[in-house]
Amino acid sequence: MEPPNLYPVKLYVYDLSKGLARRLSPIMLGKQLEGIWHTSIVVHKDEFFFGSGGISSCPPGGTLLGPPDSVVDVGSTEVTEEIFLEYLSSLGESLFRGEAYNLFEHNCNTFSNEVAQFLTGRKIPSYITDLPSEVLSTPFGQALRPLLDSIQIQPPGGSSVGRPNGQS
């Protein structure tokens, strides 16, 4: 029997604050944050992410965010591209529809964590998934929550998952 093909799985991590969180969080929140994290999963030569427009894909580093600030090796998977795209399609029709997006409770990091576990059985780093509760645990975070709840984030540069890399 042939050994299964293994495909690398990477977590792309972007600091949406471009360093401002590191400098301003002690003053505004009373605690140090290293960044405001956006994440995506790179597998099968594409980058997949979730925002207010639903699940999208692009070539790795192909959003207007540019190259990631860091790359985490999540592991490898035996899941083929065909099965993975079917899985994403089902997620896009259920858990990860665009209207389900919520900056604090159901965001790009929730998606990356779900997909990483499906592909590799591993979670993404807790410093990323714990960020919303860290912010909301501060008086400033609670005061800003109504405003922040109305924010919808969709990194430009991707296409809907039904059309990887913008192909129809």
From Swiss-Prot:
A motif (Nuclear export signal 2) lies at residues 139-153. It is found in: Cytoplasm; Nucleus. Palmostatin B inhibits its palmitoyl protein thioesterase activity. Disulfide bonds: none annotated. GO terms for biological process: protein desumoylation; protein export from nucleus; proteolysis; regulation of proteasomal ubiquitin-dependent protein catabolic process. InterPro entries: PPPDE_dom (IPR008580), PPPDE_sf (IPR042266). A motif (Nuclear export signal 1) lies at residues 83-91. PROSITE patterns: PPPDE. Keywords: Cytoplasm, Hydrolase, Nucleus, Protease. Pfam families: Peptidase_C97. The keyword Cytoplasm applies. GO terms for cellular component: cytosol; nucleus; protein-containing complex. One of its GO terms (molecular function) is palmitoyl-(protein) hydrolase activity. It comes from the Eukaryota. It catalyses: S-hexadecanoyl-L-cysteinyl-[protein] + H2O = L-cysteinyl-[protein] + hexadecanoate + H(+). Its EC number is 3.4.-.-, 3.1.2.22. Residues 7-149 form the PPPDE domain. The active site is at H38, C108. Protease which deconjugates SUMO1, SUMO2 and SUMO3 from some substrate proteins. Has isopeptidase but not SUMO-processing activity. Desumoylates ZBTB46. Collaborates with UBQLN4 in the export of ubiquitinated proteins from the nucleus to the cytoplasm. Exhibits palmitoyl protein thioesterase (S-depalmitoylation) activity towards synthetic substrates 4-methylumbelliferyl-6-S-palmitoyl-beta-D-glucopyranoside and S-depalmitoylation probe 5 (DPP-5). Homodimer. Interacts with UBQLN4; leading to the export of UBQLN4 from the nucleus. Belongs to the DeSI family. This is Desumoylating isopeptidase 1. It comes from Homo sapiens (Human).
